[in-house]
């Protein structure tokens, strides 16, 4: 790969958003910054969603209810993550950003752990549900 001597490369890097808990004004600022800066690369450091419904800590001291009671909350969490990523992706598309990196944070691993416990619902794995 040839080196681009003297060429400035721009990247926007974002940390934990924990949607739906994310600050909507901050997300608005991020999307505007993407469209103004027009970075070459976008890097998401993970923890896209709070994913409370997937958390192993949620039922640590109490009995876990049947799966049919958990799934509606899981769906809500996944939808919140998708909405956030769609909002950011829309700005990345407007800025013509082609290089995107996603690092899976600890909260983003929780859906994968949930699927490990319930392998018959693989659609909830993070990379399938939110990407």
Write out the residue ranges for each language-model feature.
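Beta-strand-turn-beta hairpins that frame and shape the catalytic cleft
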Residues: 2-11
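Core catalytic region of metal-dependent phosphoesterases/phosphodiesterases
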Residues: 14, 19-131
